[in-house]
A protein has these predicted regions:
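As written
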Residues: 65, 93-101
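Conserved phosphotransfer microenvironments
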Residues: 57-72, 85
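Two-component/phosphorelay signaling modules centered on CheY-like receiver
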Residues: 16-34
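Acidic, metal-coordinating helix/loop segments flanking the phosphotransfer/catalytic sites
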Residues: 10, 35-53
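C-terminal output helix
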Residues: 23, 101, 105-125
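Acidic phosphotransfer microenvironment of two-component signaling modules
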Residues: 16, 37-41, 108
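Conserved acidic carboxylate
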Residues: 13
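Hydrophobic/aromatic residues positioned on beta-strands within the core alpha/beta folds
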Residues: 81-82
């Protein structure tokens, strides 16, 4: 059964010490969150849920976040967080509605960027 939420965000991050505070912060800001630790789990979540956005770490222990980014529907905003900006630069050029936030990142900046991208989405569909 899919999680039905107006503001459902996928977080793909294999490091629990990064994932846990990110999920809590997103929930505090009114988002429902589904998580994945591997690229395969992330791909399953993309297929299974109606997402408003995805936050994806490119470097995972098992698989590449890149697979999740390119498999996410183009209308869904994706925030990539990475410690290696050159990795995500190509994805930002190739996939619409993709932004990079470099590690270490601010949770406040991440949520502000997410809200901005969602606002842009609503304006496109108005």
């Amino acid at each position: 059964m899919t999680k039905d939420a107006a503001r459902l965000v996928l977080v793909v991050e294999d490091d629990v010490s990064v994932r846990r505070p990110l999920v809590k912060f997103l929930e505090m800001h009114g988002f429902a969150v589904v998580t994945a630790e591997t690229a395969d789990e992330g791909l399953e979540m993309v297929r299974k849920h109606r997402l408003v956005a995805a936050v994806v770490d490119l470097r995972l222990r098992r698989g590449s976040g890149r697979d999740v980014v390119v498999s996410t529907p183009n209308e869904v905003p994706v925030i990539i967080f990475s410690g290696v900006p050159s990795e995500s630069a190509e994805l930002e050029r190739l996939r619409p509605r993709t932004r990079l936030i470099e590690k270490p990142y601010s949770l406040v900046l991440l949520v502000e960027t997410l809200e901005e991208m969602l606002s842009e989405s609503q304006n496109l569909h108005s």
